[in-house]
Regions:
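Acceptor/aglycone-binding surface of glycosyltransferases and processive sugar-polymer synthases
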Residues: 63-80, 97-180, 206-217
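Conserved donor nucleotide-binding strand/loop of the catalytic core
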Residues: 33-36, 47-81
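Acidic helix N-cap motif at the loop->helix transition within catalytic regions
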Residues: 18-22, 44-53
Length: 221
């Protein structure tokens, strides 16, 4: 709980058995009330590990619904348990959970209703090992999207995001794609509705177990 706001962390998972526990152990439970993990029909024991860690809400898809479909389940469940602030955190340990508290404070203090953990602000991406081709593609796509949307975000492709429940209730995210383009569609919906979006610099880690969109699919949108 943070300033009377119920904080819920949602974790869209796919074969995250190797990294889930260390990600979970860094979540700041001094403010986080509940955690939701959605296993998108992965082939490992992610769901079992989540249950053993004490995660109360573990949902297993009966078939692979895709990255966007996974997020829809996450957000729908968070709203159903009356979350006031919802933080999406990938369980692949690429993003540090230690920033959750800072992101939530920004929303709880009504500075911004949406906060993105940006890998591009500062030197987080390259220092953390982001491949050069991904960094260049990210910068090019972000430039194009900023021009298209008349915005000045440092990136549109981060998987570390925090939302007020009001925001989630007022956009039709369930109408979006079930694939990776979901993230960009969601940001476009927020901008269309006039919501201000804040950013916070986020150090990242790139290693074999960390999952991310591949180069080819990043150009779908």
């Amino acid at each position: 709980m943070l300033k009377s706001n119920k904080v819920v962390v949602v974790m869209p998972a796919y074969n995250a058995a190797e990294t889930l526990e260390k990600t979970y152990n860094e979540i700041p439970f001094s403010i986080v009330d509940e955690v939701i993990l959605v296993d998108d029909f992965g082939q490992d024991n992610t769901a079992e590990i989540a249950t053993n860690l004490g995660i109360k809400h573990v949902i297993k898809h009966e078939y692979n619904k895709g990255y966007g479909g996974n997020q829809k389940t996450c957000y729908n469940k968070a709203l159903s348990i009356n979350a006031d602030i919802v933080v999406m955190l990938h369980p692949d340990y690429q993003y540090t959970p230690k920033l959750i508290e800072s992101m939530c404070h920004i929303i709880a203090n009504k500075l911004y209703p949406v906060v993105l953990g940006s890998r591009i602000l500062g030197k987080g991406a390259l220092k953390g090992g982001m491949p050069i081709y991904k960094y260049v593609a990210n910068r090019m796509l972000t430039l194009f999207q900023n021009i298209l949307m008349n915005q000045k975000l440092s990136e549109y492709h981060t998987g570390f995001r925090a939302f007020s429940s009001e925001v989630l209730k007022n956009i039709k995210y369930n109408d979006n794609s079930d694939d990776f383009i979901f993230d960009n569609q969601m940001l476009a919906q927020l901008m269309y509705k006039g919501y201000e979006i804040g950013e916070i610099t986020c150090p990242t880690k790139y290693f074999e177990e960390a999952s991310s969109i591949n180069f080819k699919r990043s150009f779908v949108y």
